[in-house]
Amino acid sequence: MKEQVSQTKKGSVLRASMYVAVLIGLAAFLIFSILAAITFGNADLSLKDVYSVIAYKLFHIKSLSAYAEGAVHDVVWLIRLPRVLLALAVGMALSVCGVVMQAIVQNPLADPYVLGISSGASLGATLAIMLGVGGFLGGNSVGVPAFIGAMVTSFAVIAIANMGGKATSAKLILAGMAVSAVCSAFSNFVIYITNDKNAATEVMKWSMGSLAGASWSRVGVMLPVTLICVIIFWTQYRNLNLMLLGDDVSITLGTDLHRLRTFYLIVASVMIGFAVYCAGVIGFVGLVIPHVIRILFGTDHRRLLPLSALLGASFLIWCDVACRVILKNSEMPIGVLVSIIGAPCFIYLLVRKSYGFGGSK
């Protein structure tokens, strides 16, 4: 008996040390990804030029004052670095929201857009592009209506799911499907009656996702929102673990998941709303990344959330780099590339017989 206990303790220590090692490794890889990604782009810049701009802006080294302005400064500081940091924030947001949504609806196939957020955002963007709604917002004329559409859709789904009793996982999924269908129908109707091919092309490009509109102002909004929401969810890992067991079990343990579920949905919707505002709709990140981490480290959200955040951030950074360099003098929509990578990975996850969700095999 004592030998079994000692072996169990030894195994848990090994798993904990492995988790810490992987956490540190992913954090180091994320830092490396940021530093490496800013060296890629259509402009042919040397490593010295790139890092000299960063060093001057961060530490104000007088010997590098030549990089305080000019074309090299603008490319590195105003275009590349904000884009990399925005990819970090959006990738982190999508991955963490994927983890949370899968726990909330108790469905391993759920993604951040399960509540119809993508359809609501697309409707907002369609109205902005096709009808000129939000034209007074200037550079945010598409992003702000898309954000509003995403948030309105989320709250509508939550309200519908709470009609006739408390919201359950099944009611949330069904309400999301219904609202998503309505938003898609209205989007198609607006495109049909407007009959503007150029505007329709713009809607299609927006729906594919892009980080080309990155700026320091967007990073200044997206990054703090993401970090705050991630911290909120990480402090709630015990309740997220309970959600995988179901409402009946949680009630017997003295926890009412109904209010928590609504709160988590609102926080996740805010985070996804800002992600849509900054980058459009990018799929599969919030679906595949949580599964990869869950396969390696199980379903404990104390580990699942930070690891998913780090891996998702690095993944989207490198996807964006690929989008910039694959096509010469052009840029591939990041949503297309992520889907090309994510779909085969997701199919592989589906056929794995040894993989379970929430403790079920």
Which residues fall in each region the model found?
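Alpha-helical transmembrane segments in inner-membrane proteins
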Residues: 2-361
